[in-house]
Amino acid sequence: MGKIRQGFIKRVARELVNKYPNEFTTDFEHNKKKVQELTNVTSKKIRNRIAGYVTKLVRMKMEGKIL
């Protein structure tokens, strides 16, 4: 079974994608830097998890799986 992301990671990622839709791409490294700039997350692990979920959301939007 896979790991389930915590609710606050999903919530923060969704808020970032909705608030700054043109800031994020499908590139994880770029998204990681943007998450660092736009949030006050101090933990590297949490920042990377948020950036990973942002990347997934952007990819899903491009494929038309979410609105």
Curated annotation (Swiss-Prot):
GO molecular function term, any single one: structural constituent of ribosome
Origin superkingdom: Archaea
Keywords: Ribonucleoprotein, Ribosomal protein
GO BP term, pick one: translation
Family, similarity comment: Belongs to the eukaryotic ribosomal protein eS17 family.
Assembly description: Part of the 30S ribosomal subunit.
Name of this chain's protein: Small ribosomal subunit protein eS17
Species name: Pyrococcus furiosus (strain ATCC 43587 / DSM 3638 / JCM 8422 / Vc1)
